[in-house]
Regions:
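Start-of-helix register in tetratricopeptide repeats
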Residues: 34-35, 68-71, 105, 139, ...
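Canonical positions in the second alpha-helix
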Residues: 25, 59-61, 95-96, 129-130, ...
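Short coil turns that delineate tetratricopeptide repeat
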Residues: 30-31, 65-67, 101, 135, ...
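Register position in tetratricopeptide repeats
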Residues: 11, 46, 82, 116-117, ...
């Protein structure tokens, strides 16, 4: 009867009753503890009693199969995240890798945590494991490119950028990254090659592709075409500061600084925070 009540209260999310019944069942038969502690921990999580859930799960994980250990470590990590303790959350995610080194879900989670914490070396290491086990997706490769650039591993960044384009031939973020990298490397030949590839992309009318093509045309010396595209962006998005920002950058490349300043002022008028973007692009 108690087991049926337990199932009922779990379904109803009446976690106080769930915990009460589990405690009674364990008192009646202590040997049932190992099979009930995880359910108790889940109920404690439902009540947002994360620290108590962690304590319960640690007891449960002492004497269970590797499969159940992984399950408990995932929930412990989740509890620590809810307690804003990423360091301990990461510790338990790593414990999962000790049991299952090719767990792609955990590798992705750890790589993302490393990425947002700007631990670029660790992020690279984890994503390379995902690549090795053939579980890396476009987002993983994109994060890897950024990390490689931050670590001044330009050859690796370029190699992985080409891999992303191979997987997704219309990935605009990677094309934009390639133009910046080749421009910084003063590799005019490669820059022009990328710009030609950008121009060949289908124009789907989005702001990003229009501005990217405007920039590409200017790099290829097609000034009139570049301004046709940036003016098209302004016409389609008159209240968006980024077309004005791009137009200013195009004017700057042509040493037309007065015209550039007018565009920057208009972008700033539309969004004063646009200065942050200008600093990143400068």
């Amino acid at each position: 009867m108690s087991e049926k009540l337990l199932d009922y209260f779990e379904k109803e999310k009446n976690y106080d009753e769930v915990i009460k019944i589990i405690d009674e069942l364990i008192l009646e038969d202590p040997e049932k503890a190992s099979s009930l502690l995880f359910r108790k921990a889940e109920a404690l999580v439902g009540l947002k009693k994360y620290q108590q859930a962690i304590t319960t799960l640690k007891v449960y994980a002492k004497d269970c199969s590797d499969k159940d250990k992984i399950k408990s470590y995932v929930l412990i990590a989740s509890c620590y995240m809810n307690l804003d303790n990423d360091e301990m959350a990461e510790k338990y995610l790593v414990k999962i890798l000790d049991i299952d080194p090719e767990n792609d879900i955990i590798l992705k989670q750890l790589s993302y945590m490393a990425y947002i914490n700007q631990d670029f070396e660790r992020c690279c290491y984890l994503i390379k494991i995902l690549i090795k086990i053939d579980k890396a997706d476009i987002e993983d490769y994109t994060n890897l490119i950024f990390c490689c650039i931050q670590l001044d591993m330009i050859d690796d960044a370029l190699k992985n950028a080409e891999k992303v384009i191979e997987l997704d031939p219309t990935n605009l973020d990677v094309f934009a990254t390639l133009t910046i990298v080749y421009e910084n490397l003063d590799d005019e030949e490669k820059l022009k090659e990328v710009c030609k590839r950008i121009i060949s992309l289908k124009d789907d009318g989005t702001l990003q592709i229009i501005l990217l093509k405007a920039q590409a045309y200017l790099e290829l010396g097609k000034k009139q075409k570049a301004f046709e595209f940036v003016n098209k962006a302004i016409k389609l998005n008159p209240y968006d500061p980024f077309p004005y920002l791009m137009k200013g950058l195009l004017y700057n490349k042509l040493d037309m600084h007065d015209e550039a300043e007018e565009c920057f002022n208009e972008a700033f008028r539309l969004n004063p925070e646009i200065l942050d973007s200008m600093e990143k692009l400068s």
